[in-house]
Amino acid sequence: MEEKLNNKYSIIVNKKRRYNADDFKDFKYINITSTDGRNILIEEVTNIQFNKLKEEMKKQGINIGIKYALRNEQEQSDLYKKFCEKYGKEYADKIVCPVGTSEHHTGLAIDVEVMVDNKWIINNDNIEISEPILKVMHRYLIKYGFILRYPKQKENITQITYEPWHIRYVGTELANYLNQNNLVLDEYSY
């Protein structure tokens, strides 16, 4: 079963295993528009599956969109600096990965935003509004091959604070396996 589950989407990037562009050379990336109107890149299959998830959420009366997908090293550095200025270094270290250790370098990770009253809700500033809505989305992640990358009960393993908006595409089979065995990708990959 292990060999079957080790698909190309099982590659992990974190503080222990830095991003290596060679691992992702066979992936196809496409341009999309983020919730704040920026042109961003995302891995093609990840985007296809996210659009299916998005349609599922519309049936639930929930509008979701992509705030961030692929971030290059400069964008990651800029985001880290912004978080340090806005929230302080201690908080930034818990929620924004250093350059080279972010799954956003892969294009397989997505920061999801929800729309409330025709406005996209910024997760860090309005977690009390977005989290209950995102928890509805969590129930459908596996069906479309996604996992909640940084769950609350696994912070000591992921070394990242709980992020209800951060999902990661791994494929449906691996998503099911991780869920059934109560594992995060870090536990599976090592």
Where do the protein language model's features map onto the residues?
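Extracytoplasmic cell-surface/polysaccharide-interacting catalytic and binding patches
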Residues: 1-190
